[in-house]
């Protein structure tokens, strides 16, 4: 678990340490975290930073396990208060996030995200409960149990980015749904590959 930053001076190092602590406080778990601050100590004294680049592995954010994230911020406004620098104002993040299909399955069956798994089962399969989710190369497989029948229904889907969110489309029908999405997040690309979900997008972050 390492934090790295541009070694342009003690002010940037102090800010890098503060940002690292803030990022970890926003996550349930962080395995590896690397930061690079783009700017100069002079800019920082004026309360400005050009951008921050972030690379993280094995992160759990709001109950969602992320294998890998590579993000870059827009310009940042920083208040150099005594002891610990503080970010001012909202800022933008853009970049890529990768999740393993097996991890996504566990998340959607967890208490925190069960509502979304069951919503998918209801919207896409007409059944109240999601049994499992599997990513088979570039295909999404959903399974839902049939109540009182001792059996399960399985359906295959593809996904893509649409209207700022993720659209899931039935392979054998015209049915499709768009995931409910935080208005501060815009998904620009969504694809399945090698048992993993890859997302690219932009998010507005409030410190």
Where are these regions (language model features)?
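N-terminal beta-strand/beta-hairpin edge segment
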Residues: 24-103, 205
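Short, hydrophobic/π-rich interface segment
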Residues: 150-182
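Surface-exposed beta-loop interaction hotspot
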Residues: 83-143
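Short, exposed beta-strand/loop patches in secreted or surface proteins that constitute
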Residues: 130-135, 157-160, 188-190
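Extended terminal
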Residues: 172, 176-207
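Short secondary-structure junctions
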Residues: 24-33, 124-127, 180-184
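Short beta-strand segments that buttress and anchor functional surface loops
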Residues: 56, 141-147
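Hydrophobic, proline/glycine-rich low-complexity stretches
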Residues: 1-31, 39-42
């Amino acid at each position: 678990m390492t934090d790295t930053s541009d070694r342009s001076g003690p002010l940037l190092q102090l800010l890098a340490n503060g940002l690292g602590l803030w990022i970890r406080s926003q996550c349930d778990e962080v395995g590896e975290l690397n930061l690079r601050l783009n700017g100069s100590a002079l800019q920082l004294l004026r309360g400005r930073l050009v951008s921050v680049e972030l690379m993280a592995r094995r992160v759990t954010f709001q109950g969602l396990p992320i294998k890998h994230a590579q993000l870059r911020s827009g310009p940042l406004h920083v208040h150099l208060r005594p002891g610990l620098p503080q970010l001012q104002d909202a800022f933008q993040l853009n970049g890529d996030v990768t999740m393993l299909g097996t991890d996504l399955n566990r998340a959607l069956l967890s208490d925190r995200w069960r509502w979304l798994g069951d919503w998918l089962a209801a919207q896409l399969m007409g059944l109240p409960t999601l049994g499992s989710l599997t990513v088979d190369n570039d295909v999404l497989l959903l399974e839902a149990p049939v109540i009182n029948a001792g059996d399960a229904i399985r359906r295959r889907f593809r996904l893509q980015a649409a209207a700022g969110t993720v659209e899931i489309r039935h392979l054998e029908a015209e049915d499709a749904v768009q995931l409910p999405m935080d208005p501060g997040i815009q998904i620009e690309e969504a694809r399945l590959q090698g048992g993993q979900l890859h997302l690219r997008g932009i998010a507005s972050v409030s410190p």
